[in-house]
Amino acid sequence: MDLISEAIDIMANGGIILYPTDTVYGLGANIFNNEAVQRIYEIKKRDPSKPLSVLVQDTDSLELIADVNMNSREIVNKWLPGPFTFILNKKKIVSPYVSASTKVGVRIPDYKIARALASLFPITTTSANITNECTLSNPQEILRQIGDTVDLVIDAGNLNKAKPSTVIDLSSSKPTLVRNGFDSNDLDSIKDDLDKLV
């Protein structure tokens, strides 16, 4: 069994993985396993009222968990895969354990390994750190911070940029830049695209 298959099998059985993305290392769990999702909150010491984002393999998978209107579809199709999290209105299939609100943040990373991990089901994507502590770029440093809390580590070495994704809320008629995270050369261009939707 290769490492990707092993990771998927672990998550399918309620396990947690540490994995690389195009931005930072993430903590991954099957979003349909509420106990596993709760473990993510415990590992991060995160307030359960704060939502987790979801990683999907492609735009077809995205539309299974979130409502995508014509305007947001144009943005999603143009800018994903990429270092963005788009907040969309969630569908009922998304558990309140993942997001207690009516919205969900969705990612399709520009990183083949990360997308492959979500080939059978969507997974959580949240930075692998204790809440309010620094985001680290190296798996060994991450494990020193969060302890022996994950079931598998996919080690891609040091992620040089290691900055969080840029978060954009597309859930209403007026798109909003929520967080300017990853240093994207495309940020000005996507802002122009968002302005056209207003």
Provide a role label for each language-model segment.
Residues 1-198:
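Active-site-adjacent structural elements in enzyme catalytic cores
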